[in-house]
Curated annotation (Swiss-Prot):
Its EC number is 2.4.2.7. It is found in: Cytoplasm. Its main location: cytoplasm. It catalyses: AMP + diphosphate = 5-phospho-alpha-D-ribose 1-diphosphate + adenine. GO terms for biological process: adenine salvage; AMP salvage; purine ribonucleoside salvage. One of its GO terms (molecular function) is adenine binding. Homodimer. This is Adenine phosphoribosyltransferase. Keywords: Cytoplasm, Glycosyltransferase, Purine salvage, Transferase.
Length: 183
């Protein structure tokens, strides 16, 4: 099933836009409204599974927290394992971490050291691509463990915030179902 214009429009229309959230001047794209629509949620998963079913993926990595909501079902659909990347202190086994820059400060992500094996072909999944900082840190974690990032997939791409270009500089191609302006 290749995504049709009608299907993609349905997905786009299922995502609510909230003005001035979380602060004045921001137009927030709320993917949780897509989750409330079982047809839209299933369609988003089905389209990603269809795109990657013959790509040789053997692990899907999802970033905290909404990346779990899309990454885990995509992993099930592909018949492969799912690996969560989390904020510090949330994973019980030995981890490695990566610090990345935010607009005001820094943040950190962690992954279990035994979750990715050398040579694993990994699909990174998250709900939204904005500036690309979270995904760039996730890619660094995967590569430090010897994994190969095959692609990064998103439901939403805020195309004017530079995330796609940032990932390209790291050698990562990306795919998104629904483009929106970020401003």
């Amino acid at each position: 099933m290749t995504a049709t214009a009608q299907q993609l429009e349905y997905l786009k229309n299922s995502i609510k836009s909230i003005q001035d959230y979380p602060k004045p001047g921001i137009l927030f794209r709320d993917v949780t409204s897509l989750l409330e629509d079982p047809k839209a949620y299933a369609l988003s998963i089905d389209l990603l599974v269809e795109r990657y079913k013959n790509a040789g993926i053997n692990k899907v990595v999802g970033t905290e927290a909404r990346g779990f909501l899309f990454g885990a079902p995509v992993a099930l659909g592909l018949g492969v394992g799912f690996v969560p990347v989390r904020k510090p202190g949330k994973l019980p086994r030995e981890t490695i971490s990566e610090t990345y820059d935010l607009e005001y400060g820094t943040d950190q992500l962690e992954i279990h050291v035994d979750a990715i094996k050398p040579g694993d072909k990994v699909l990174v999944v998250d709900d939204l691509l904005a500036t690309g900082g979270t995904i760039e840190a996730t890619v660094k974690l995967i590569r430090r463990l010897g994994g190969e990032v095959a692609d990064a997939a998103f439901i939403i791409n805020l195309f004017d915030l530079g995330g796609e270009q940032r990932l390209e500089k790291q050698g990562i191609t990306s795919y998104s179902l629904v483009p929106f302006p970020g401003h």
